[in-house]
Amino acid sequence: MSTIKVKSAHKDGQIKLEDLDVVCNKLCKRNNSVLFKLEKYLNKKLLSDPELTEIRDTILTVSGELSRLRDNLVTDGDSNEGLQ
């Protein structure tokens, strides 16, 4: 598969191109950071409450989908047999 780049705005205002894998990895880390900060802010574990568990599971699902994004991409010329 060809290299996929993503435009990324940095704190200094510059626009840079980063590999898709790098961007997805950063987003996964941010999700994990949000979970940690949420537990710290609430002063309780997210697994201690059904609604918080649902929020946790949603965030972890998004992280998982980001991790698998490259494997699920279809670009022009790729075979998409069985996807219909």
From Swiss-Prot:
It comes from the Bacteria. This is SPbeta prophage-derived uncharacterized protein YomY. It comes from Bacillus subtilis (strain 168). The gene is yomY.
